[in-house]
Amino acid sequence: YTPVSDVNLLAIYRYYSPYYSNPYANALCSWSRMRDEHGGYIGLEYNKLKNWQLSTFADVWKNGYEVMAQGDWLPKQNYHMHMRFRVKEKDEACTYSLRWNMAYQMGRWKMKTQADGNLVKGALTYGWSVLQDVEYRFSGFPIVVQMRAQFFDAREWTNRIYIDEHDVLYAYAMPFVYGIGGRFLLNARYKIND
């Protein structure tokens, strides 16, 4: 629903019977399976401020809730900054998470810096991750090289951090990390008929 040109509003009520079962369903729910749940979701997006896009949502169900607020700042076409704060209470644990990233492009170079952190209130555990992506497009040769360096400290499973990453063509991966360590990725893409 768009009450005015710069505001978008979405409201959804869901009810899944305890007797309903569909292993291939893909709908809004708090668990990975759609069964025995009812709840409400409301989202708001605001685009009135120059170079800013603000959005928030709340999802409430029988045994928990999730609330998120995020802001995107786009001062120039080649620069983008994003910040997101999320609170999720589920299974008697409350998780606070924060993500900040900045992406920019300079000629043939594309860079992205990202920092993630979370805190589980019930267990008083935390996790963090920082990463740097670098992409280069060669001139006169149809190849793109992408590199990533990531370091993390998420000692508990409840503090795992999900990070999106490039995969093979037309595929998308969202692995998680936990423990203490680093990851280094190198991905090259060659366009045959260019």
Set out the residue ranges of the language-model regions.
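Exposed, low-structure sequence patches enriched in small/polar residues
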Residues: 1-194
